[in-house]
A protein has these predicted regions:
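Residues at or immediately flanking beta-strands
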Residues: 26, 63-67
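Bacterial N-terminal signal peptides that target proteins for export
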Residues: 1-9
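Contiguous mixed-secondary-structure segments that line small-molecule binding/active-site clefts
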Residues: 51-58, 63, 85, 90, ...
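Sec/Tat signal peptide C-region and signal peptidase I cleavage site
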Residues: 17-24
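Short helix-initiation/N-cap motifs at beta->coil->alpha
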Residues: 67-82
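Nucleotide donor/acceptor-binding cores
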Residues: 25-27, 165
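Extracytoplasmic "Venus flytrap"
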Residues: 28-50, 71-75
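Bacterial N-terminal signal peptides
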Residues: 9-17
Length: 165
């Protein structure tokens, strides 16, 4: 009798293990930047942003794995929007302007000098323009996890250029 109960308990434990394994999820994350370390050991900050999300999911121990496809290895940069709206791609880090062929309004987010610094980026994210942009994004079934703005957008050898003067 004891052996029979032990066998049932073992069978139930194995079944529960198999069921919990069946719920493990792998999310696909795509971006265009290198996923390899530079000579100084650092990584591209946009890759690091996606890697932080993957690392935090792993630390949370919630049976969700984030598989990162860097360097255009899954989708080309301007091809990522459509797969995100159809569920073929779970996460991406890309300039929103790359989806402008679907939503021309997105091009406004890539204008050089739009965001001057981090403080301005926080304020800009609450602007009427960005509220409308976020509505378009949400209506497409995409959720923004993080806004990443890079100040400037102009090139100079001597200083950061923040305006057209």
């Amino acid at each position: 009798m004891f052996k029979k109960i032990s066998l049932y308990i073992t069978a139930i434990a194995l079944a529960l293990t198999m069921v919990s394994s069946a719920y493990a999820v792998t999310l696909k994350a795509s971006h265009q930047w290198p996923g390899t370390a530079r000579a100084d050991g650092s990584y591209d900050p946009r890759h690091e942003m996606v890697q932080i999300i993957a690392d935090e999911m792993k630390k949370a121990n919630v049976d969700v794995d984030v598989r990162i496809y860097p360097a255009k290895s899954l989708y080309k940069p301007k091809e990522q929007w459509k797969p995100m709206t159809t569920g073929q791609l779970d996460m991406s880090a890309f300039p929103l302007g790359y989806a402008a062929k679907f939503h021309p309004e997105f091009d406004a987010t890539l204008m050089p000098g739009t965001v001057k610094n981090h403080k301005h980026a926080l304020k800009f994210n609450k602007s009427p323009m960005m509220v409308e942009i976020k509505k378009i994004i949400n209506d497409a079934g995409v959720i923004v996890l993080s806004d990443a703005w890079l100040g400037g957008g102009f090139a100079s050898k001597s200083k950061c250029i923040r305006n057209p003067r």
